[in-house]
């Protein structure tokens, strides 16, 4: 059920020194505090209180709202999804929706999806309320609730319609800041987490993007003894940001969980309600696209094409070419759309890497995706998998070698004409305790995965086969900072002129989201309209 709530945006700006989101939620509570019950005002300072499976129930026996987060629909200017999870059946899950000045004006009933974790036999239920017919470039307030629990507040802003300025951010490979170590030395939660997985969430809020792209390997639940707790830890950490702005994911190899669905992605597919790509229910949510302003974002699932065996199970080729056919059609449609200037691809594994003794680049991506990126002139690719930051020169075409080495078409590093080639970014310093910035080759070289060997019981996977090559495409590498993200500021320009995206890579330097600018560059191209 969707909400039809078109009201004008509040014209008042937040007072100096008060955050925009605090201003919005405080205003909403003042207007409709009685509408959310006696605890309404207290919601403004609500915080995560631990994994949902361990929450103390209220008097009614209902668990609280857990892991509140947002996703965009296919049209980010009019569609949003509010999601939260529990491990118990709940009654009447719903979202109260309104504006900061007018209060809650409608109620949207949520649909519930569930999966049963094969390792713990615990069933997780995720409620998704689809908000539709929203007004572009507008602030909303909402409260997620089900019977017998206290509502949780959030704010949401729709994307602008057409060519308007906007900001988004991107990083991958986050993990969680909650390690969950027991007295006997075992970990019940993510065993490669670090405090920086929490710091980066605070840092994203300091930048306040319209949305954040999370480039795969979200929480590493497939490495954890307790997968349910690890997912809950991840959402508890990130709801500090994701309840205020959509975090749009790409699935990584560590979202592949043995026993959870036919190809291992039931948890990921249940927690997120991303735009429908028209794929079968079994493949739902593994690839998708959405439009924000003049930017078309396409999220891909690279395990379908990668040679590397990096998950709990080897699933290369699982879609039978369905994802590639969808991608080609999606890119063609984007380039036919006169309202789209920029095409950005978000994915996990990478076609470029100068890390030694780590994952490396994957030939499967170079074979399956890069020819399409060239054909349809994709502007920007953001990925993770390698736990550091680096970027390529604009790339177009490939050498006629077995590794299909991408060809740089320009070496200017500050101002880049994106019509000449695609810039690839590795942004994998999201927070894990295994960064790779200290593992970079002294001079740019690349280990390319060209295949896999037979299954090795000692490592419980198929070992990668590597070919080492030079990396003439390498433009910038951050050796010094293990953690960070990139912010992208879209400037639509003027009719008849150019449009640009200014990219700023920030190193996250400690508690409270400390930031240091490390790399900047600007993509530019003729404006389409």
UniProtKB/Swiss-Prot annotation:
Q: Which domain of life is it from?
A: Bacteria
Key words of the record: Signal
> One GO cellular component from the entry?
plasma membrane
Q: Is RNA-binding included in the keywords of this UniProt record?
A: no
Signal peptide extent = 1-52
Q: Where is this region: Disordered?
A: 1-20
Provide an example Pfam family for this protein: Pur_ac_phosph_N
| S-S pairs | none
According to its UniProt record, how is this protein modified after translation?
Predicted to be exported by the Tat system. The position of the signal peptide cleavage has not been experimentally proven.
**Matches recorded under PROSITE patterns:** TAT
Transmembrane residue ranges: none
Q: Which GO terms describe its molecular function?
A: acid phosphatase activity; metal ion binding
Q: Identify the InterPro entries for this entry.
A: Calcineurin-like_PHP_ApaH (IPR004843), Metallo-depent_PP-like (IPR029052), PPA-like (IPR039331), Purple_acid_Pase-like_N (IPR008963), Purple_acid_Pase_N (IPR015914), TAT_signal (IPR006311)
Could you tell me which PANTHER family the record lists for this protein? Answer: ACID PHOSPHATASE RELATED, PURPLE ACID PHOSPHATASE
Q: This chain belongs to which protein, by name?
A: Uncharacterized protein Rv2577
Give the organism the record lists.
Mycobacterium tuberculosis (strain ATCC 25618 / H37Rv)
